[in-house]
Amino acid sequence: MQIPQDSPEFLNLLQRSGLLTADQIRRALAELNLPETTSAHECAAAFVAARFITPFQAERIIEGRYRGLTIGRWRVRELLGFGGMGCVYIADAPDYPNKVALKVLAGKHAVDNGMLTRLRLEARAGMKLRHPGIIKTLQLESTGAVHFLVMDLVRGISLHELVALQGPQ
């Protein structure tokens, strides 16, 4: 894992992440007008403040963990939650108008036929069922060994947060 120390190293990892193209980075740098002596942390903070990337994305790149910030055409914006099957991220794509939730099957389950079947069944059910209490699944996608559901993003609070606010009923 390569941890960036200065802005050129940060920008190299940012480009390698796939979040921004080299041209987009050049345009951002022209707009930000950062000094050459800018540290990786200062560069990341400037890109976040200008909304070129999210705090989650900046943190991952600063840690040297730039892989996985793009999954297929989707750009991972932040972690929404995680569980036994994997993680759920908020994501967007240049060719899609809304942010979505990506439910990504954990790497350890990518070769587990039982978990892949479970993900496919969940996708089928989520695409067929229509109910205000069920989040709509838009599609099931795979890129390489990464399998994931693309779902409508519904903002709200978790059950844990609800119980903390209102107490058990």
Which positions does each model-derived feature cover?
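Short N-terminal regulatory/linker segments that flank and modulate the kinase catalytic core
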Residues: M1-R77
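Conserved ATP-binding/catalytic core of the eukaryotic-like protein kinase fold
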Residues: D6, L14, V48, E63-Q169
